[in-house]
Amino acid sequence: MSLGDLGFHTVSLSGPATLYELAEIRESLLAAIAVGKDLRIDLETTGPWDLAGLQLMISATASGRRAGQAVRLVNVPRVCAEIAERSGLSNWLSSVTDTFL
């Protein structure tokens, strides 16, 4: 994890974002939210994805919002965007994403 620009704390995730990895990813995201700064989640080196991974991103943004923090996604992989599209969540994903791959 590193401090990003514009006052955001940036956490870079890598590897699979599926049901089997959620506990570890969730703990990383909760720790990042606990820093107390707006959060940028870099997803460039993540994959494969499943719906559980997308649900975790929804949960992270909601947790940040409850804590008064902005949570933004960057470098969202195409496969994640495709899952959002199939799930009817494209508009939500676009609303929290700064960049797609």
Predicted regions and their residues:
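STAS-like cytosolic regulatory interaction modules
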Residues: 1-52, 58-101
